[in-house]
Amino acid sequence: MSTYSTKVDEKWQKKWEETSLYKFDENNLEKKLYVLEMFSYPSGAKLHAGHWFNYAPVDSWARFKKMTGYNVFQPMGFDAFGLPAENYAIKTGIHPKDSTLKNIETMEKQLKSMGAMFNWDHEVITCTPDYYKWTQWLFLELYKNGLAYRKKAPANWCPSCNTVLANEQVVDGSCERCGTEVIKKDLTQWFFKITNYAEELLQKLDELDWPEKTKAMQKHWIGKSKGAEVTFKVDNSDLKFDVFTTRVDTLCGVTYVVLAPESPLADELTKPEYKEKVEEYKLQAQKQSEIERQSLTREKTGVFTGSYAINPINNKKVPIWIADYVIYTYGTGAVMAVPSHDERDFAFATKYDLPIVRVVEGGEELPFTGYGPLVNSGEFDGLKGNKAKEAIVSKLSENDLGRWKVNYRLRDWLVSRQRYWGAPIPVVYCEKCGIVPVPEKDLPVELPYNVEFNPTGKSPLTTSEEFMNTTCPHCGGHATRESDTLDTFVCSSWYYLRYADNENSDAPFDKEKISKMLPVDKYVGGPEHACMHLLYARFITKALRDIGYLNFDEPFLSLRHQGLILGPDGQKMSKSKGNTISPDDIIAEHGSDVFRMYLMFGFDYAEGGAWSDDGVKAMSKFVDRFSRMIETAKEEINNPKNSKTDMGKEEKELNYVRNHSIKAVTEDMDKFQFNTCIARLMEFTNSLSKYLTVDNKNIKLLKDTTIDIIKLIAPFAPHFAEEQWNIIEEKYSVFNEKWPEFDEKALVKDEVEIAIQINGKIKAKINIATNLSEDEIKSAALADDKVKAATDGKNIVKVIVIKGRLVNIVVK
């Protein structure tokens, strides 16, 4: 019978807690290892299999590191503000605070049932005033240093619900709640100046131990482009506008220019006879998301304004159009169109019968997007590539109509949310003093409990007069609080800093302590956060460094992503599909460690895969078998029937597998290849089980090997391993033990099995000494009885030896 069950889980969890086994030693930072999993959002009532796939394997890696001598800091908390709790409140009437704290209580129990090595005394919960006080402090620091500002910007607006929607709430251009078409509405909102750090965010990526795909995604998101900014004057007007282009060499081929529908110039440039069509087009553009507008497969549309611009290089008049594929917040919100050398411009010009003029030689047909000698470009004809660009920019700069420019796709971070369940923005508005930041001594600006959640067209906080009406900290007169709350990504942009000093009531963290504890050594979470959370956290770290609070450049030195656990049907798990897996049910039946080990063995950690109930059952059988093996080993160790001290063939074979397993598991653990680690453990289990059937055993080797295999399985099955360790060693705890080291000498075999082929087909396998010469190997192969029988009466033409693997005998 197996000695493992949920009772074993409970027994050892209680013991670990009583003895503070995993307490981080803040006075011993020489071998500090900060291991961090992205904290979870308590929107659902319980953790699902995906959470476990993030947390359990990383906990195994942390345990392994503890056993190799590291002082592991592995905190846990909850990203507790956000939209789902507020939507749940609108739907059910249950207050977000009540539902969130209840869910956190449930999830804490689940996480503890995992037996993870979390430092719970460092827990942070972002919706508590003692946390968001410092989120508000962060806002004020950025504001004081010119990195937070307020401006008008378009937001998703549902006319039916009378509320702003996050991008995630817009599905196919409609409100996910009521199905009404979403429009864009200009609102005055708060931004963080992440663009100030665009170049550093880009350059520092190459120094990080991060997945290449994630680094590539951030590089694309930042989107650095080197080119030129060209000024176009409007014909018969004092108006002018700039365009950014990476192909200034094609400037003579511009046959029209395009403005974004949101551009303020659109109204000024539109002639009266075109006004109605332009307004209608702008209204349609408001209903499209930026992703839809920039789609390469979507047919391009536009409308003529009736105005013309002057091409600054040849003084030709070109029509000014409005088109929704131009985004106002990217670049200058205007583009020059060269249909002969750009596919999008070519399609647009063809559709609207606009001129197409070739200015670059090359290609059999248009559009030709490569480089070549210029044609139809006046004084620049014959110039090519960079020389053409330099000559044209030089000419433009003489008249202040062009200049070199570096452009970034990255835009400033919009942090305002017209929602309730978030950290209040700590500013007030005074008629006399204007925008006034709340003094730090008055933080936190607490979120009121009694508010009206149902959408009214205004931020929910405006329904609380007690909250909104306040006194100006500057003049003492009447003031009104900001009614927007902060994006939840602001809360998660700095939580890794608070973990290290979570009980500090005087500051968000102690600078000296942080300088020793940070940066995070290993960070693990989903790849979907590449261009938001991971980018925002990098920005906040750099901003706080420059303000003087941090002495490091990057928050996360090493990053790993986990894959996705799918339902048994291979589809993404969801309640509506009925394919979700409850960790609680599996733990109740098989125990926490069976669940952990199945997650690590059944899937490549970076890839994930489809769930299998049979896989869980197979892992349960393996744990039972391992348990029986340890019981047998204990009996043999305590009551040896026959014992020897020398190292015979069986001992050398076991010792080889033992040391090979230690080496392989150690190396694969650091690669996060948990599935191969457990495969090695299974091979090791087979080898030790086989040795237990030998009559005359080396008891010292048996005990040492049994101790090592328990140590190796400990990170993967911590409760189970403690129980097995207690059986063999009868002392506490296996996690206070040193990780086993392999012996290089034991990895050199005295004998090796080789295959013998005759004309390419395997006829026999023999064991030979590893130090035999090639001639000796040939002789051993030809002396085998099966080989003799197969070659009898035949002419041996050639004998080919591949050392350590095979002998191929060619006969006729």
Swiss-Prot record:
Superkingdom to which the source organism belongs: Bacteria
InterPro entries named in the record: Leu-tRNA-ligase, Leu_tRNA-synth_edit, M/V/L/I-tRNA-synth_anticd-bd, Methionyl/Leucyl_tRNA_Synth, Rossmann-like_a/b/a_fold, tRNAsynth_Ia_anticodon-bd, Val/Leu/Ile-tRNA-synth_edit
Keywords, ordered alphabetically: Aminoacyl-tRNA synthetase, ATP-binding, Cytoplasm, Ligase, Nucleotide-binding, Protein biosynthesis
EC category name: ligase
Motif 'KMSKS' region mapped to chain: 572-576
Gene Ontology MF term list: aminoacyl-tRNA deacylase activity; ATP binding; leucine-tRNA ligase activity
Residues the record lists as binding ATP: 575
Entry annotated with the keyword Nucleotide-binding: yes
Catalytic activity: tRNA(Leu) + L-leucine + ATP = L-leucyl-tRNA(Leu) + AMP + diphosphate
Protein name, UniProt field: Leucine--tRNA ligase
Organism field: Clostridium acetobutylicum (strain ATCC 824 / DSM 792 / JCM 1419 / IAM 19013 / LMG 5710 / NBRC 13948 / NRRL B-527 / VKM B-1787 / 2291 / W)
